Each structure stands twice: as C-alpha cells, then as structure tokens.
Amino acid sequence: MTSLPVLLFLIILLLPSMITEGRVLTQTGKEATIFADQKTNHEADLKNPDPQEVQRALARILCALGELDKLVKDQANAGQQEFKLPKDFTGRSKCRSLGRIK
C-alpha cells in the first residue's frame, strides 16, 4: 500500500510541469527567449493548454507510474527493505518516447 501514496505524490508533482514543459518564465521573471521558428503565444498556451498535449502528458505519467509500481513490487518480492531506484531508470524508461511533447 505504500506505492499508492508514492504514485499520488508523483502525479501531483509531475503533472503541472509536464503540461507547461518549455513554456514557463525563467527564475528572474523575464520573458523566455523565443527562437525565430517558434511562433507561439506562451500566455495563451498556459491559459488554454492544448488537449493533445495534456493527453500526452497524462499518458507519460500513467506509463511511468505503471513502471514504478512494477519496480516497487519486484523489489518487495525480492525482499529488499529499502526502495532503490536504479540510476538509469529514467534513461531506459519505455515512457520517454510515449506521447513526446513538441
């Protein structure tokens, strides 16, 4: 049952950042640099996110949560007391290519 709080925490933590990925201001609060081939209204994107991007972000989160849940169960079955996330977990994840946001 400890995996459920971890999963909920990851959803709450990752969802806002995945939806607005690449569309936020820097820490100084200055407007982000816009390249010549990037013609987007960032404020409009933040107010009205593209439903497809939201769907892709949710698909990536659900995929990652499924992999994390499987990893937790595998470690529990192996009798490990501590949860140890492999260093290359994010690099080898099947979810990286799933629903890639522009």
From Swiss-Prot:
Mutagenesis or variant effect for R92E: Reduced neuron activity in the VNO
Disulfide topology: C63-C95
Signal peptide from the UniProt entry: 1-22
Gene3D superfamilies tied to this protein: ESP1, core domain
Location in the cell: Secreted
Keywords associated with the record: Behavior, Disulfide bond, Pheromone, Secreted, Signal
InterPro entries according to UniProt: Esp1/Esp22, Esp1_core
Effect of R56E: Reduced neuron activity in the VNO
Site feature (Required for activity) residues: E67
Tissues showing expression: Expressed in the extraorbital lacrimal gland from where it is secreted into tears.
Pfam families listed in its UniProt record: ESP
Physiological role: Male-specific phermone which is recognized by the Vmn2r116/V2rp5 receptor in the vomeronasal organ (VNO) and enhances female sexual receptive behavior (lordosis) upon male mounting, resulting in successful copulation.
Family: Belongs to the exocrine gland-secreted peptide family.
Name of the protein described by the UniProt record: Exocrine gland-secreted peptide 1
Taxonomic lineage: Eukaryota, Metazoa, Chordata, Craniata, Vertebrata
